[in-house]
Amino acid sequence: MKKVLFLVGPHASGKTYSSREYIAKNENIGMIDTGPIMRRIHKEMDPDTSMGDWVKKLEVQYGKNITSQLISNEIGKIMSNDECDKFILIGFRTLEGIAFTIQHLNIEDFSILYVDATKELLYQNYLAREKKNISFEDFKNYLQNELNSGLTKLMKMALNGEMIDYYYRFSNDDNFEEKIDSYLTNCEIKKLRKEPKNGK
């Protein structure tokens, strides 16, 4: 049976970097990022249409679960062809998408961790990773749009301790590899909760 950890949270919160660091030190663990999967499917199906318009068109034709189904199908293929028995899944933005994947792939052993950070840290990491010249104000608007896509609901559930755990990073020195390990090795999970100072 595959063990799955869903890492969710805003762009540039450190999910991918920390996962890669953890995987480099541990064997038999895979990481699947839904972002590249979705971009590849978009390129194969309708490259001349923008991602947003393409998704809207698909949902009109096939229903709102179509993107979740496409992503889940690809995740299922990767898992079935990979010898790893533990996976970290990154890129989910909605509870509905996570729930669909869990049900569609019959995932019984799973955990969900919301990784958050200060807006300043997110901005710093975004600039370093994307190499884009964007103002802090524009980035905050970008971040709010991302939260509005479904992350706000996940964050509130995490803060309330409803099925989702929560980890808050004040700096890039806040390493949560130990927390990842606690989920993937079946150790007793301690509800480590780093609450944001001054309400973020």
Feature annotation, model-predicted:
Residues 13:
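ATP-binding Walker
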Residues 127-199:
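Small-molecule kinase domains that catalyze NTP-dependent phosphoryl transfer to phosphate-bearing small molecules
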Residues 16:
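Walker A/P-loop
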Residues 30-88, 92-100:
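ATP-dependent small-molecule kinase phosphotransfer cores
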Residues 90-91, 107-130:
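Conserved phosphate-donor/acceptor-positioning beta-strand/loop module used by diverse small-molecule
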Residues 10:
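P-loop (Walker A) phosphate-binding loop of NTP-binding proteins
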Residues 28-31, 112, 163-169:
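Conserved beta-strand scaffold positions in the cores of enzyme catalytic domains, especially
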